[in-house]
């Protein structure tokens, strides 16, 4: 029996959505292959790496000469002693980037991460899995041919939505290794800490700095929408709170919004991704511009309005049967009616039942994804514990 060494690519230590994916991976492996060891790039803060019990690797997205091969010169016993994995130590690469490969992100990221794994590391002896994520489009020069290399080498590629599937099938319609599977953080069910019991049943606004970018006009429109949501949802008499899902940019938006309101609203800002998910899971309703905030709500059958910056928000609302609760920022006339539909759904037992049924279907698809991943790993690494 041997221990499986697994490198996780694409998970940022500074992003709660990414850390939820890490938590979901660790939880699932603890049930099926409890001896597995995980590694992330050594650029992670040491305290975070220690907290999650992770080994370190040389970052795959560094440019220039691939220094990771120099690590092979260090004796394996010493590498293990200091918690480092060289490329030859790694049995499995799991890419959990979420949304990082397509024209929006450019060719360099795709080449340095996915293509490098496919062409420089992948052999018949190891396993390369792209976990569910949004992918494409691949229209810019070099993008299609680069991703085709990944399609040719990866053992399994899971795309998170139908639009991504179209982008991938546009390159290779008959690929046997591509699956349509949802975001897998829907299988996490963290407990709400006792100290936060009073937030149960709150209405949450979850902002996202990516909604505004560098465009002042867009920033003004987005803040106007958040003001509209705060006014309308606050009028219900329910506890209303701003939830900071990610770092300083979202925090600044919360401060800026509160400065515009006649009465500032409470800000919930928990460092733990699991506690953040638990708060969302006991909400009455949410208005979310954070993708994993939206998943946390919908998976817990919490009615939600989506106000997002990419196709992935509309896609997930369609998956959960709530496309009528998707906001188009440009269509200001639809803001209030959509928010009214949200509050009606939140009060309506049948709407919640339908959402719970859709959530169960999505969880089944995530279970199917993991079943296929573990069947693949057991087939390719029969000696692993």
PLM segments and residue spans:
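Active-site anion-handling motifs in enzyme catalytic cores
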Residues: 1-385
């Amino acid at each position: 029996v041997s221990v499986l060494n697994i490198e996780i690519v694409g998970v940022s230590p500074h992003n709660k959505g990414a850390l939820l994916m890490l938590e979901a991976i660790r939880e699932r492996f603890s049930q099926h292959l409890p001896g597995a060891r995980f590694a992330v790039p050594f650029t992670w803060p040491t305290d975070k790496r220690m907290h999650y019990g992770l080994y370190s690797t040389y970052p795959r997205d560094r440019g220039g000469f691939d220094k990771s091969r120099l690590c092979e010169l260090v004796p394996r016993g010493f590498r293990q002693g200091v918690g480092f994995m060289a490329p030859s130590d790694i049995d499995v690469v799991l890419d959990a980037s979420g949304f990082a490969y397509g024209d929006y992100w450019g060719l360099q990221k795709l080449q340095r991460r996915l293509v490098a794994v496919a062409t420089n590391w992948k052999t018949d002896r190891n396993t390369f899995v792209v976990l569910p994520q949004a992918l494409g489009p691949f229209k810019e020069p070099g993008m299609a041919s680069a991703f085709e290399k990944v399609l040719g080498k990866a053992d399994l590629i899971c795309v998170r939505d139908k639009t991504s599937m179209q982008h991938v099938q546009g390159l290779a319609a008959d690929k046997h290794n591509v699956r349509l599977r949802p975001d897998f953080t829907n299988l996490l069910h963290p407990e709400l800490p006792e100290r936060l019991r009073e937030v149960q049943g709150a209405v949450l606004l979850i902002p996202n700095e990516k909604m505004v970018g560098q465009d002042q006009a867009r920033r003004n429109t987005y803040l106007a929408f958040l003001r509209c949501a705060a006014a309308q949802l606050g009028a219900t008499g329910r506890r209303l709170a701003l939830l900071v899902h990610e770092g300083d940019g979202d925090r600044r938006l919360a401060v800026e919004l509160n400065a515009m309101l006649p009465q500032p609203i409470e800000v919930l800002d928990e460092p733990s991704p699991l506690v953040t998910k638990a708060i969302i899971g006991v909400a009455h309703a949410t208005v979310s511009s954070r993708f994993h905030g939206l998943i946390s709500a919908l998976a817990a059958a919490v009615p939600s309005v989506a106000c997002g910056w990419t196709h992935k928000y509309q896609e997930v609302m369609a998956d959960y049967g709530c496309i009528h609760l998707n906001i188009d920022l440009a269509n200001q006339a639809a803001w209030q009616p959509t928010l009214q539909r949200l509050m009606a759904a939140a009060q309506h037992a049948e709407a919640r039942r339908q959402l719970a049924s859709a959530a169960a279907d999505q969880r089944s698809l995530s279970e199917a994804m993991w079943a296929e991943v573990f069947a693949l790993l057991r087939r390719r690494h029969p000696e692993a514990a």
